[in-house]
Each structure stands twice: as C-alpha cells, then as structure tokens.
C-alpha cells in the first residue's frame, strides 16, 4: 500500500500554509501555529488524512472505477497530466469547462468531435483537404485536446474526483457535489473545506508538495489496478487452493 510519511511531507513543504491574514477560520482545527506570519499546518492531521485517501483511491482502482484528477493552476498542470496519464486515469489540467460533469451529454458530443478529428488526422483525410481547411481542423482539434483531451477515455461520469487547490477548482467541486461524486481535496489554510469529502490539509502552491500528492495518488491507482486484475485474482485463488490441500492432507 503506498503511504506518505511525515518526513516526506516536511521535505516537500506540505506544512507551509498561507499568510496568516488570508486564513479561513474553517481550517483552524488543522493549524499548528504561525511562523513569520505564515500559518503552519499540523501534519499530525495531514499524514493520516492523506493515507486514508490513498487507501480509498486504491480500493476504487481495484474495482476498475475512474478517479478524475483536477489541477488547472500553473503549478499543478504538468504534474497532473503526467501522473494521471501514468495511472491511466482521466484528468483536467488546462481549464475546467462549466458543465463538464453536470452537462456531460454536451461534453460527450465534443469528445466525439475530437475523436473524429483525431481519426481524420491519422487516416490521411487531412491530406486530401485544402491547406486552409486542414489548418482549421487542426486548430479545432488542438483546442479540443487542451480542454477535453484528458477525459476522452473517461467513458461516463467519474466515481471520484481528486483536486489540487479547492478554492481554484470551486466550480468542479460544486458540480461533483450536485452529482454525489466524492471529492478528495488538498485544502490550504486560506481555503474553505466545504464540499470536500476527504480533506487533506496542506500546501497547494509548492510544486514539490503538489508532486508528492499527485504521484502518490497515481501510485495508489496503479497498485489498486494491479490487485484488481484477473492475474492477481488467479494468484489469490491458487494460494487458497494450496492452503486447502495442506489442511486436507493434515
């Protein structure tokens, strides 16, 4: 089971919150104190909260459920895209389009258009078009790639959503709440934890901290997927069978 230690978190700067004047009183229970007018997050809360969230994600992945990774702020974009792709999970790393979940039917239409253009670009259709028409279609495809490329294989609504910076992704969280999709979120000292089912109190700005969260989540997805695979189930069956033989022979 992938877990993250307090030492890992300290090295990544997870404990550094925002300036004290920007704090949200709802995060008071997670604050250890202040240093140089910066709130310090109590990692005694963060470590178990994060490891509990990893266990939930691992369990979901073992049941072939989809976890949507969301991080559209500049510091998170690259890591969210890379790690979600590594884990084989959907992601939104550029911009959250209003209605991405609550108006999924329309989004599905855009995904179909994107897939069609992708096919055309690969099967030689673009080469038969005028330069201008081919350029226009390429531009449309690139735009769609940016906005929905990460969810093209989601195949329906996700089973959970993992969010970096809940304040920045408030619309995404509201949509998930409306649909009863559980939200796991990294919540800094300036943010409102409302609407987040699994609160991970921590720094949501430092690239090292973001890498730590997102990489561990991707690892949990991969480990869960391995355990839920037919090969893993077969290994388990063989083990049980051999135990039964020993018992019968004894």
Curated annotation (Swiss-Prot):
Gene Ontology molecular function: any one: structural constituent of ribosome
Which terms does the UniProt entry file under GO BP?
A: translation
GO cellular component labels = cytosolic small ribosomal subunit
InterPro entries found in the cross-reference section: Ribosomal_uS2 (IPR001865), Ribosomal_uS2_bac/mit/plastid (IPR005706), Ribosomal_uS2_CS (IPR018130), Ribosomal_uS2_flav_dom_sf (IPR023591)
Pfam name, any one: Ribosomal_S2
The answer, when asked if Disulfide bond is one of the entry's keywords, is no
Keyword rRNA-binding listed: no
Q: Which domain of life is it from?
A: Bacteria
Q: Which Gene3D superfamilies match?
A: Glucose-6-phosphate isomerase like protein, domain 1 (3.40.50.10490), Helix hairpin bin (1.10.287.610)
**UniProt keyword terms in alphabetical order:** Ribonucleoprotein, Ribosomal protein
Query: Which HAMAP family does the UniProt entry name for this protein?
Result: Ribosomal_uS2_B (MF_00291_B)
- Record family assignment: Belongs to the universal ribosomal protein uS2 family.
Q: Which NCBIfam families match?
A: rpsB_bact (TIGR01011)
Protein name in the entry: Small ribosomal subunit protein uS2
In its UniProt entry, the species of origin is given as Teredinibacter turnerae (strain ATCC 39867 / T7901)
């Amino acid at each position: 089971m992938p877990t993250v230690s307090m030492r890992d978190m300290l090295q990544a700067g997870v404990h550094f919150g925002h300036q004290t004047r920007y704090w949200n009183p709802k995060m008071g229970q997670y604050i250890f104190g202040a240093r140089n007018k910066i709130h310090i997050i109590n990692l005694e809360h963060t470590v178990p909260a994060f490891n509990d969230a990893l266990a939930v994600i691992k369990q979901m992945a073992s049941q072939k459920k989809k976890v949507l990774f969301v991080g559209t702020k500049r510091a998170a974009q690259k890591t969210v895209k890379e790690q979600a792709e590594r884990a084989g999970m959907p992601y939104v790393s550029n911009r959250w389009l209003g209605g991405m979940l609550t108006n999924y039917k329309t989004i599905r239409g855009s995904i179909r258009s994107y897939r069609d253009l992708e096919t055309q670009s690969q099967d030689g259709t673009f080469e038969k078009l005028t330069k201008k028409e081919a350029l226009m279609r390429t531009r449309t495809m690139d735009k769609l790639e940016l906005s929905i490329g990460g969810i093209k294989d989601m195949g329906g609504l996700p089973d959970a959503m993992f969010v970096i910076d809940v304040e920045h992704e408030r619309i995404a969280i509201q949509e998930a709440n409306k649909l009863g999709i559980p939200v796991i979120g990294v919540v800094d000292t300036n943010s409102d934890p409302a609407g987040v089912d699994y609160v991970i109190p921590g720094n949501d700005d430092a690239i090292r901290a973001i890498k730590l969260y997102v990489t561990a989540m991707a690892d949990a997805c991969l480990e869960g997927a391995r355990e839920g695979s037919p090969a893993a189930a077969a290994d388990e069956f063989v083990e049980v069978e051999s135990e039964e033989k020993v018992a019968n022979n004894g």
